């Protein structure tokens, strides 16, 4: 029963439930918790569960008007992180009804909205989420997916090759188009707008779209294969973004691009729906991801951002390169590359996968290896990423 004693109440009395059996419909989260000195890990884990679901800092009479048992998040398991002092993995189960269907925005607002500024925690990181089919089925997911993309491009059995046009800022639209033509004519499948190329004074978006489309069709005619240029539709408003996507559709180009973290999940999901309805592929750049995922003990791991993107919608997403980094990085990167491409991914802690994830029939996303790679990296990249990937040079 709800106690009405005045004052601050320990969260663990209500929200730490080690005997809880998780339901197939629960959304499960794994948090890396670093409590403040003197705060027991159970209290810290329960605080996260409470603050990201139904809890507040005291008992209020309106608690009696609803069923907390039905709606509260529960911290159901805590384990110390091996090799780290005062760090714990807290597992939290959220009832499905806490989340709006088909909204990545609402999912993140609930799970990571408030808790990260919490006084009882020194640091907090969301390491993984288990999205149940009951929830993932409320999302459209990628506009087309890997198989449909290959059919559209008529390119099979190999990674796709792309490059980013440089210098990324400062070229006129006509010279930019020239560079696109040379790259595509020379044998690349795709060229790419840089993520910062939107619509600046030296090159307005419509001029760029026209010259790139011209370059594309010329290269297609001369090579006899289908070519693409990721036209960056990211804009200051969602309406402007959709206007740019509509212009790309009218030009008949195969693919547009979006910066999904700076643009936001709501805008991204709208664009993904537009792309499916209008036969456009959607390339996703992850500008700003390191702000969120770089710290080991605070923020959100990229595998969560990647899962969220698969739900929100995108056909390609940048996912790091692995080349030249540590071995451990390689396994972790391959873990979230599998989460992007495969239907069913087994729990595997060595690859950072905390939960078994079943996507059922949601289309896959092509991982894009991009950032500081050159031709000598090719053998390593093809071995790491396999056929279903985009190797993006420049």
Curated annotation (Swiss-Prot):
Cofactor binding note of this UniProt entry: Binds 1 Mg(2+) ion per subunit.
Cell location: Plastid, Chloroplast
A GO molecular function held by the record: monooxygenase activity
Gene3D superfamilies recorded: Ribulose bisphosphate carboxylase, large subunit, C-terminal domain (3.20.20.110), RuBisCO large subunit, N-terminal domain (3.30.70.150)
Reported cofactor(s): Mg(2+)
Reactions catalysed according to its record: 2 (2R)-3-phosphoglycerate + 2 H(+) = D-ribulose 1,5-bisphosphate + CO2 + H2O; D-ribulose 1,5-bisphosphate + O2 = 2-phosphoglycolate + (2R)-3-phosphoglycerate + 2 H(+)
UniProt-annotated binding residues for substrate: 114, 164, 168, 286, 318, 370
Site location (Transition state stabilizer): 325
InterPro entries: RuBisCO (IPR033966), RuBisCo_large_chain_AS (IPR020878), RuBisCO_lsu_C (IPR000685), RuBisCO_lsu_C_sf (IPR036376), RuBisCO_lsu_fd_N (IPR017443), RuBisCO_lsu_N_sf (IPR036422)
Residue numbers bearing the N6-carboxylysine modification: 192
Active site per UniProt: 166 (proton acceptor), 285 (proton acceptor)
UniProt binding sites for Mg(2+): 192, 194-195
A family per Pfam: RuBisCO_large
Function: RuBisCO catalyzes two reactions: the carboxylation of D-ribulose 1,5-bisphosphate, the primary event in carbon dioxide fixation, as well as the oxidative fragmentation of the pentose substrate in the photorespiration process. Both reactions occur simultaneously and in competition at the same active site.
NCBIfam families, sorted: PRK04208.1
PANTHER family xref list: RIBULOSE BISPHOSPHATE CARBOXYLASE, RIBULOSE BISPHOSPHATE CARBOXYLASE LARGE CHAIN
Name this polypeptide is given: Ribulose bisphosphate carboxylase large chain
Taxonomic path: Eukaryota, Viridiplantae, Streptophyta, Embryophyta, Tracheophyta
Gene name of the encoded protein: rbcL
């Amino acid at each position: 029963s709800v106690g009405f004693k005045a004052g601050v109440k320990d969260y663990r009395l209500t929200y730490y439930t080690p005997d809880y059996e998780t339901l197939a419909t629960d959304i499960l989260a794994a948090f890396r918790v670093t409590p403040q000195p003197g705060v027991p890990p159970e209290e810290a884990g329960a605080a996260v569960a409470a603050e990201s679901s139904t809890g507040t800092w005291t008992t209020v009479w309106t608690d009696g008007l609803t069923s907390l048992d039905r709606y509260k998040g529960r911290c159901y398991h805590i384990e110390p992180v091996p090799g780290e002092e005062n760090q714990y993995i807290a597992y939290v189960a959220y009832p499905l009804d806490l989340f709006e269907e088909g909204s990545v925005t609402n999912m993140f607002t609930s799970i990571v909205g408030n808790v990260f500024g919490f006084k009882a925690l020194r640091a907090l990181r969301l390491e993984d989420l288990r999205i149940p089919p009951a929830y993932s089925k409320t999302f459209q997911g990628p506009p087309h997916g890997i198989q449909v993309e290959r059919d559209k491009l008529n390119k099979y059995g190999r990674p796709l090759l792309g490059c980013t046009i440089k210098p990324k800022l400062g070229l006129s639209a006509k010279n930019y188009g020239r560079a696109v033509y040379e790259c595509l004519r020379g044998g690349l499948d795709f060229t790419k707008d840089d993520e910062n190329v939107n619509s600046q004074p030296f090159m307005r978006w419509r001029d760029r779209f026209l010259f790139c489309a011209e370059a594309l069709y010329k290269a297609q005619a001369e090579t006899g294969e289908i070519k693409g240029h990721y036209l960056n539709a990211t804009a200051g408003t969602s309406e402007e973004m959709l206007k740019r996507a509509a212009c790309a559709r009218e030009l008949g180009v195969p693919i547009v691009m979006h910066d999904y973290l700076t643009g936001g999940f709501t805008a991204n999901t709208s664009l993904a729906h537009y792309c499916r309805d209008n036969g456009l592929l959607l390339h996703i750049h992850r500008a700003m991801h390191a702000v969120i995922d770089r710290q080991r003990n605070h923020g959100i791991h990229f595998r969560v951002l990647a899962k969220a993107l698969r739900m929100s919608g995108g056909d390609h997403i940048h996912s790091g390169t692995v080349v030249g980094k540590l071995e451990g990085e390689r396994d972790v990167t391959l873990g979230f590359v599998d989460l992007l491409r495969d239907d069913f991914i087994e729990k595997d802690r060595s690859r950072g996968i905390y939960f078994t994830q079943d996507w059922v029939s949601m289309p896959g996303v092509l991982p894009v290896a991009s950032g500081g790679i050159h031709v000598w990296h090719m053998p390593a990249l093809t071995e790491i990423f396999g056929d279903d990937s985009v190797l993006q040079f420049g």
